């Protein structure tokens, strides 16, 4: 008889769909191949997915909620993905949906912002980083000219490595150094704090931030202040 084992799989916040599927395969829950197929081609009955076209596994980016799940192994890819989507559907409350509605944005846009926050923070300052993102989006006449310039978007398109200067030339709508506004969709699956920050950002006049030698985020209104700070921090010196 085939033995079924129970396994707990913890999906870390900020993992991409590809990383989650790799983790599930490594945990013997389901194969990458099946998961990719079911992510790309199955039409899930959730209102938040209805406007996202089928055809690519990345259509679920942002919607596979990071949490600890219990699975019996092996399990069908359809069941596994559906379980994560159900969790997102629970966590993303009616109150949050009303907030999205009121903001004039879509759930997809809010999750895209949340995914940027998730990848840019170490678990602190989410709401202030959210303010920088929205300030840049909402004021295309600022020094930042509507460009988000977020390194994590380069990591999403360069195969997952630490970005280098040349990556800023990659021609992809996810390249926020090249293309203004939000990328086409989330770049990872954000946790609850990042989603909340995307819904309720702080109100600031900040357009820049950088991690200091003290491992704390410092925020700036102008490019000059930002550059001055970078010059004062040993972590940004060459050599």
Model-derived features: where do they sit?
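Bacterial extracytoplasmic/cell-wall-associated proteins, especially those involved in peptidoglycan
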Residues: 29-30, 43-239
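DNA-binding alpha-helical recognition surfaces that contact promoter or target DNA
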Residues: 22, 37, 228
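Acidic helix-start/capping segments at beta-turn-to-alpha-helix junctions
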Residues: 14-17, 37-46
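Short, flexible domain-boundary/linker segments around small modular repeats
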Residues: 1-3, 47-48
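Glycine-rich loop/hinge motif
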Residues: 2-29, 99-105
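A short alpha->loop->secondary-structure connector
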Residues: 25-41
């Amino acid at each position: 008889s085939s033995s079924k084992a129970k396994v707990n799989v913890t999906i870390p916040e900020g993992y991409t769909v590809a990383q989650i599927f790799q983790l599930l395969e490594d945990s013997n829950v389901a194969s990458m191949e099946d998961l990719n197929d079911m992510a790309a081609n199955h039409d899930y009955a959730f209102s938040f997915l209805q406007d996202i076209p089928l055809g690519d596994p990345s259509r679920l980016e942002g919607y596979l909620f990071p949490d600890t799940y219990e699975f019996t192994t092996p399990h069908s890819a359809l069941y596994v993905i559906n379980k994560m989507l159900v969790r997102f559907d629970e966590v993303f409350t009616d109150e949050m949906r009303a907030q999205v509605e009121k903001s004039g944005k879509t759930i997809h846009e809010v999750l895209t912002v949340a995914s940027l926050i998730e990848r840019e923070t170490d678990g602190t300052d989410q709401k202030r980083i959210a303010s920088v993102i929205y300030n840049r989006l909402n004021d295309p006449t600022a020094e930042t000219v509507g460009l988000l310039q977020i390194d994590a978007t380069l990591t999403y398109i360069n195969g997952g490595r630490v970005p280098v200067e040349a990556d800023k030339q990659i021609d992809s709508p996810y390249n926020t150094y090249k293309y203004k506004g939000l990328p086409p969709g989330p770049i990872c699956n954000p946790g609850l704090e990042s989603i909340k920050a995307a819904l309720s950002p702080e109100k600031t006049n900040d357009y820049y931030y950088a991690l200091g030698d003290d491992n704390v985020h410092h925020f700036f209104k102008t490019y000059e202040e930002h550059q001055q700070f970078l010059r004062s921090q040993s972590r940004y010196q060459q050599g």
